[in-house]
C-alpha cells in the first residue's frame, strides 16, 4: 500500500470516528443539560425534555439506581465536592456510548467492507440486530438480578459484624457501570462464536474440543470481576456465561451441519 493510499484510509477512518464521537458527545451533553419532565397524555405518562442542568436526566438515572440497587440501611454519600457531578458524567457518557454503538458498528463495517468477503459481510449483517438485543439483555440481567444480590450480600456481611455501611457515589456508579458493561459484552459470546465459525476461521467442533479451557477462563473471569472472595457471587457471572457458551456451541455446530447438508 502506498503512502498516499494509507493517508486516504486514515482520513476516512478519522471522519467515521468523528461522527461517532459527535453523536456520543451530543447524547452525553443532552443528558446533562435536560430534565425528563412527566406529563399525562391520553391516560398514559410520557416524558418530555426541559432544560435543567441541575436536575438533569443523568441525575434522575443516578437517583433511580440508588432506589433500585442500594440495600435498605445503606447511605449513598459523596465525600468530596464534585463526586456526584462526575458520577453523572460517567452515567451520561455510558448512555452516549450505548446509543452511538449501532452507528459505530455501521461506520466500522463501511470502512472494512472493501477488505471483506461477501460471506463475511453477510455474517456481519445477520448478527447486528441480535448483538444489540443481547447487549441490552446482559445489562438488564445485571441490573435486575446480579447487582442487587451482590450489593445486598456484601452489605449483610458487614451488618453481621455490626458495621454501618456508607457507599461513596463514585464507587457505587463505577461498580454498577462495570457490571453493566461486563454483562453486556459477555452476552455477545454466542454471537462471537457463531460469527467466527460462520466466517470459516474455525470449524464447529472447535468449541467442543476446547470446552475445558473455555470453562476455566469463564470461571477465572467471574472471580476477577466480583469484588469479594466468597466464591458465591462469582457464579452470578460465570453461570450465565457458561450457558451462553453452550448456546454458542450449539448454534455454531448447527450452522456447520446445515452448510455440509447444503453442499452434499
Swiss-Prot record:
Disulfide bonds: none
Pfam families in UniProt: TatC (PF00902)
Keyword Transport tagged: yes
Transmembrane segments: 20-40, 85-105, 131-151, 175-195, 211-231, 232-252
Predominant place of localization: membrane
GO molecular function: proton motive force dependent protein transmembrane transporter activity
Subcellular location: Cell membrane
GO cellular component, one term: TAT protein transport complex
UniProt keywords, alphabetically: Cell membrane, Membrane, Protein transport, Translocation, Transmembrane, Transmembrane helix, Transport
GO terms under biological process: intracellular protein transmembrane transport; protein transport by the Tat complex
Annotated membrane topology: Multi-pass membrane protein
Function text: Part of the twin-arginine translocation (Tat) system that transports large folded proteins containing a characteristic twin-arginine motif in their signal peptide across membranes.
Subunit-structure text: Forms a complex with TatA.
Family as reported in the entry's similarity comment: Belongs to the TatC family.
Record's protein name: Sec-independent protein translocase protein TatC
Higher taxonomy: Archaea, Nitrososphaerota, Candidatus Cenarchaeales, Candidatus Cenarchaeaceae, Candidatus Cenarchaeum
